[in-house]
């Protein structure tokens, strides 16, 4: 809230500075268009707003990368499940023949462990994506308000001759 009050004060300083420049110039017999300075200030603020919006887009791209991580985790999990099902089918048909040569309990334990680790990776990706979106939006909003405040106050101070 204080930032918005600060921005309003800076714009007031810009308007007062442009009015005082017009008054000084009219005393000397010169004509100055005070609206040009205000227009320059508005253009500078709009440029800062665009840069803040670009930061929002960058945050959304980071969030989409988290979503892609989730999709890849789901695909890997499905491949692991299909491999486990295929192994169960093979195990059922070959158990009698190869029971002396292969230890199927070890193989099934390995598949179960890989499924657990894949599901853990999937949950980690989901949590990252869920946390990335609000965080990216908040960071972008903070950067946007700070850039607006910084640019408008720099312009206001330079118009007043304080910078």
From Swiss-Prot:
Tell where it localizes. Answer: Membrane
Locate the coiled-coil region(s) and give their ranges.
Answer: none
Give the matching InterPro entries. HAP
**Tagged with keyword Cytoplasm:** no
Q: Name one GO cellular component term.
A: membrane
| First and last residue of the signal peptide | 1-20
The Gene Ontology biological process annotation of the record reads: cell wall organization; sporulation resulting in formation of a cellular spore
Q: Does the keyword Signal apply?
A: yes
Keywords (A to Z) from UniProt: Cell wall biogenesis/degradation, Membrane, Signal, Sporulation
Task: Give the protein family.
Answer: To HAP-P protein.
Summary of the function given for this chain in its UniProt record: Might be involved in spherule cell wall formation.
Q: This chain belongs to which protein, by name?
A: Sporulation-specific hydrophobic abundant protein
* Native species: Physarum polycephalum (Slime mold)
């Amino acid at each position: 809230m204080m930032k918005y009050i600060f921005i309003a004060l800076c714009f007031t300083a810009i308007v007062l500075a442009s009015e005082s420049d017009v008054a000084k110039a009219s005393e000397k017999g010169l004509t100055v268009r005070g609206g040009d300075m205000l227009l320059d200030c508005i253009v500078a603020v709009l440029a800062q707003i665009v840069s803040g919006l670009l930061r929002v887009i960058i945050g959304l791209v980071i969030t989409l990368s988290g979503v892609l991580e989730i999709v890849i985790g789901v695909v890997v999990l499905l491949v692991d499940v299909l491999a486990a099902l295929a192994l169960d089918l093979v195990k059922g048909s070959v158990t009698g023949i190869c029971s002396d040569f292969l230890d199927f309990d070890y193989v099934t334990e390995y598949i179960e462990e890989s499924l657990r680790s894949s599901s853990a990776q999937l949950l980690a990706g989901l949590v990252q994506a869920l946390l990335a979106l609000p965080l990216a939006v908040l960071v972008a909003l903070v950067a946007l308000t700070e850039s607006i405040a910084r640019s408008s106050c720099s312009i206001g101070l330079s118009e007043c001759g304080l910078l």
